[in-house]
Amino acid sequence: MPEVSHTLDTSFVIRLLTRDPLPLFRRAAEFLGQWKTGAPGFLVPDLVLAETYFALQHHYSFSKEDALSALLSFTRHPAISVSTCADKTLALPQLSTAKPGFVDRLIHGASERAETPLVTFEKSARLLPNTIVLKV
């Protein structure tokens, strides 16, 4: 992961992606706009991506596809760093209809980084390596 100088939170990312409210969007855009090529960038943790994904849908009426597209575009900014898992997951084709979905894949990525199996009841997770799907 490239060197980072700050971690961005959900409220910051939401303002950039929704432009709402406008004064906060302008301030967030100004802050991001101060970044210079070659300078340390900004980390966006998986939890922030997951919260933003749900907030865009439930508070701003984005479709799953539009929320994921907005996150993908945002994470492609040269100053933005995300986990390898988030980067690869956001690049998956048809992610908005994929099973397991975006957040489940982020959770699986965290279990891989921890070098532990993921234990779940989510049947679709059987497609992911090192995953135990419990049956009732």
Indicate residue ranges for each PLM-predicted region.
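Histidine- and aromatic-rich ligand-binding microenvironments
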Residues: L8-D9, V44-P45, P100-G101, E122-K123, ...
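Alpha-helix capping/helix-boundary segments
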Residues: F12, V48, D87, L106-I107, ...
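Acidic, PIN/NYN-like endoribonuclease modules and their adjacent C-terminal/linker elements
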Residues: M1-S5, H108-V136
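Active-site-proximal, substrate-binding regions of enzyme catalytic domains
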Residues: Y53-A79
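Residues that scaffold the ATP/ADP-binding catalytic core of kinase and kinase-like folds
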Residues: R15-L17, A55, L128-P129
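Short, well-structured N-terminal submotif of metal-dependent ribonuclease cores
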Residues: M1-V44, H59-D66
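A general alpha-helix detector
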Residues: F12-V13, E51-A55, L90
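Active-site neighborhoods of divalent-metal-dependent phosphate/nucleic-acid chemistry enzymes
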Residues: A79-P117, F121
